[in-house]
Amino acid sequence: MILDEIVEDKKKRLPGHMARIPETEMRRMAEETKTREADCFYNHLKKPGLSIIGEFKKASPSLGTITSKIDLMERISEYNASVDAISCLTEEDHFHGNVAYLKEIRAKSSLPILRKDFMICEYQFYEAKVIGADAVLLITAILDDAQMHDFYQLARELELDVLVETHDEAEVDRAMKINPRIIGVNNRNLKDFTISLEHTRRLRPYVPEDKVFVAESGITGDEDVRFLRDCGVDAFLIGRAFMESENPKALAQKWKELYQA
């Protein structure tokens, strides 16, 4: 399965990161890194109306290279004027991400930043804090219950918000055991990368109304926005549609107005 391959490649990558900066040093740096604004990711998504997380990614296993022509700073400037938070891929092998991209975004944006990666060890959480992330992603499909609990607690101790990602009823049930404030449904099946917004519709009743409910992936047009609005979604995480758009600011404004209609 593609997901297993991604996780295995992540395990191979981590020793190199740790060799450059040992975990004890990364932890010390994380503990000394001042929190920019506590709970900012959660607060930006919790506000009334539709919240949008604009994603920066250069590639994905399902699409290959999305575009090689986009300038990072130009796209972030557009996001600064249009979205409520930014998601940055830092996975190197399959999404062509890099922690350097997140650092650059942090230097140019005051918006909350989600580090989107396959988080499988404590080191990555310390690193996320140090490079300037405000939130991290926990993917239920790649973690057991003990890891979910421990990683969530670690993130909150570091004053990082957490987006807990699910894909089916069993994963939502597992996610709810840690009582997350933000829970997402990935409409893309990470095992075969097929997409269906029906996952969000089907899982909405399982998520309490007091949680911020995020729809991830597969949002490409007006009909998708209407469908997810009617499902009771609080926020969208949008990658490809914004990365391929010539005017993401106008697209975000259009979809926010459509959501309110």
Place the predicted regions along the sequence by residue.
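Conserved N-terminal beta1-alpha1 strand-loop-helix module at the mouth
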Residues: 1-113, 120-122, 154, 159-179, ...
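Generic leucine side-chain signal with a strong bias for well-ordered alpha-helical environments
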Residues: 3, 102, 137-138, 143, ...
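Glycine-enriched alpha-helix->loop->beta-strand junction motifs that scaffold or abut catalytic
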Residues: 82-83, 108-111, 130-136, 156-160, ...
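Hydrophobic, well-ordered secondary-structure scaffolds
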Residues: 114-143, 148-151, 155-158, 163-166
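Electropositive, surface-exposed helix/loop patches at the edges of structured domains
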Residues: 123-131, 153, 172-182, 200-207, ...
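Glycine-rich phosphate-binding active-site loops on the catalytic face of alpha/beta enzymes
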Residues: 127-147, 185-192, 233-251
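Catalytic-face loop-and-helix region of soluble metabolic enzyme cores
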Residues: 182-224, 229-238
